[in-house]
Amino acid sequence: MSNKVKPHINIVVIGHVDSGKSTSTGHMIYKCGGIDKRQIEKFEKEAQEMGKGSFKYAWVLDKLKAERERGITIDIALWKFETTKYVVTIIDAPGHRDFIKNMITGTSQADCAVLIVASSTGEFEAGISKNGQTREHALLAFTLGVKQMIVAVNKIDNTEPPYSEARFNEIKKEISAYVKKVGYDPKTVPVLPVSGWHGDNMIEPSPNMSWYKGWEVEYKDTGKHTGKTLLEALDNIPLPARPSSKPLRLPLQDVYKIGGIGTVPVGRVETGILKPGMVVTFCPANLSTEVKSVEMHHESLPEALPGDNVGFNVKNVSIKDIRRGMVASDSKNDPAIEAASFKAQVIILNHPGEIHAGYQPVLDCHTAHIACKFAELLEKIDRRSGKVIETEPKMVKSGDAAIINLIPSKGMCVESFSQYPPLGRFAVRDMRQTVAVGVIKEVDKTVAVAGKVTKSAQKAGVAAGKKK
């Protein structure tokens, strides 16, 4: 089993609506991936019959997406491909209405963002314009803590003339300046010309760009790397550190009821370790129970580590008691406690008016989606230096950064960014867009009351509500 040895990394694919994300993503999965060849042949045949032959890679992705949305499989294995060094999981294939929202909840899971920009005339400009998605996606990726970025300049076969060196250099210059402005160090961001459709520089170096000498990056820990393809760029990402020594935090993505097994919550271990036999507490339900088994890709695991997307079976818990957005933690080691309120540094990205105390948008934090009130605007700060410009401002508007005290409208489990990064960043959504992003500085936790403890948890010897 090659998978056992290779570390897993998660990537998120971002970029403007027609940049070719689906085709490029489809291509990678198709050529290096976990899709069974028979399945591909079936998809191809269907694509031909429906006159979608030219769309084959994107079509593969659409089929997978449809299956995922209809809940036919809980099998994330399809969204995988391997490089020499890593097993890569694509966490969210774009094109979703809620892509930005998923990106906020999902990006906390991404080790690397692959930003795809279209090089054809007009398309690049549209994506990078003031309200283009390229900008918003890149800024979100950085704010939400995605350490690595790779930029693929796509549709290079579609430039004037095709495979134009001048056009690539023009885009490379602009995109490097932009990722720098967002906060990335351009020295660590490979920018490469590709065709997701024809496959140029995706997996093998392109025969069509003799001018292209390759990308070069320099990482702090691993030094200089060069290469020509997207596959090599992914292969050279520094291995992300996994916070397995911290206490367990596992935000639930879904909860399934599986015949003959019972209730199976599914989510990704963000910090700590999940093992069978452990007694977990679900917050904010304040319910403790024993973990019977842990599975990943249909194989049972002795333990799940940060980065693992797993399902785990819990005893005596009804599917009605737990839901997406709750957090599982170890009842004996700094268990998660509901937040009464929390203080956060918030950057207002695009809000048409003024935001005053009392504003109540929806926050997306890890997998939770909950309305929270901006209870007090404490300080307005300079985005660059972090210095306080004004205390107790009357209002904030687009472009401002502020320290704000927030109160959730119902039970919500969040943590400070410094302790548990994935549970300490959020997006503020209103009017179907991302109005702001924030990082949690400190959390005022509710006083723990004795929660419900299932029989299996009592057997495993838990004192309810015993919190530090």
From Swiss-Prot:
Its main location: cytoplasm. This is Elongation factor 1-alpha. This protein promotes the GTP-dependent binding of aminoacyl-tRNA to the A-site of ribosomes during protein biosynthesis. Residues 92-95 are annotated as: G3. Keywords: Cytoplasm, Elongation factor, GTP-binding, Nucleotide-binding, Phosphoprotein, Protein biosynthesis. GTP binds at residues 15-22, 92-96, 154-157. Residues 195-197 are annotated as: G5. The modification 5-glutamyl glycerylphosphorylethanolamine is found at E303, E376. Residues 15-22 are annotated as: G1. PROSITE patterns: G_TR_1, G_TR_2. Residues 71-75 are annotated as: G2. Residues 6-244 form the tr-type G domain. GO terms for cellular component: cytoplasm.
